[in-house]
Amino acid sequence: SIEAPLITVLAKMEMEGIKIDQSVLMELSNTFELELQELEQEIFELAGETFNINSSKQVGAILFDKLKLTTVKKTKKKTGYSTDVEVLTKLAKTHALPERLLRYRTLGKLKSTYVDSLQGLVNKESGRIHSSFNQTITATGRLSSSNPNLQNIPIRKEEGRRIRQAFIPKEGCILISADYSQIELRILAHCAEDEILIDAFNSGEDIHARTAVEVFQVVPELLTDDLRSQAKAVNFGIVYGMSAYRLANELSISRKMAKSYIDNYFKRYAGVRRFIDAIIEDTRKIGEVSTIFGRKRRIDDI
């Protein structure tokens, strides 16, 4: 009743494709290339020597052996220094080089994965990109997209929004973007039958502001944008089972404080706590969990 009717819809989407303004991508490619060259020179000047920026081993040697920056963590095999995003983000607070390296990596990925790659995927006959939408691959039942992944075109930063400008409607049409408002939390409120969450949604309240008031125990008049932002991270973190460790990293706070946020959340939203515990208990017994539409997912060894 859900998957079968969707097959025709997805087939039409794949056949239709989406129009691309290649001139936008070509201009972006040139712009990004120039900035990458400038970043490269900045990085070499900050390092005091030239090296392979794309080599984690050489980057680690510069940061930790030469510049003596504090080691955050080793690689998985414990054979060298980790220079992943988490490490560079922390180091960027103490030195300019890690920040420039992050910028270089981000821009390089945008250029290679999106700007340059998309140009090669335009169908010569239709002038459009025809992605594949995969209906039965993900364990959760969500759609995935490939060749290219049109569900993962960046949007959060300015460069990502510029890439999206290359996607254009055919003549006489417009592109419409629609999104459910806080759909995960609304479903959570419904399934958990949590009175506080339900009341907040029915009253048209800002759910993140409400959570900030409930979890951080502040009066609405003293609520700041920063507290609301933290409450948003807590709200969505709870939905996806985020640990105190992960929340601490997300908000740049101590693990103890992150745990207190989670504990306060469950104290205020007791219905959510009961719902999560019940789902885990039932899943352990029968080895599967179902959505409100009856779609089942097998989960062993929970």
Residue map of PLM features:
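Structural motif
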Residues: 1-2, 181, 202, 223-230
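Conserved "right-hand" nucleotidyltransferase catalytic core of DNA-directed polymerases
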Residues: 1-156, 168, 174, 181-184, ...
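Active-site phosphate/pyrophosphate-handling residues
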Residues: 5-8, 186, 234, 297
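Short, intrinsically disordered, charge-balanced linker/junction segments flanking boundaries
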Residues: 47-50, 281, 293-302
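Function-dense linear segments that define catalytic or interfacial modules
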Residues: 135-220
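Feature representing long, continuous alpha-helical segments
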Residues: 161, 185-186, 190, 209-210, ...
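Long, charged amphipathic helices and adjacent flexible linkers at domain junctions
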Residues: 201-202, 211, 217, 275-296
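Structured DNA-binding interfaces in DNA transaction proteins
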Residues: 209, 220-249, 253-262
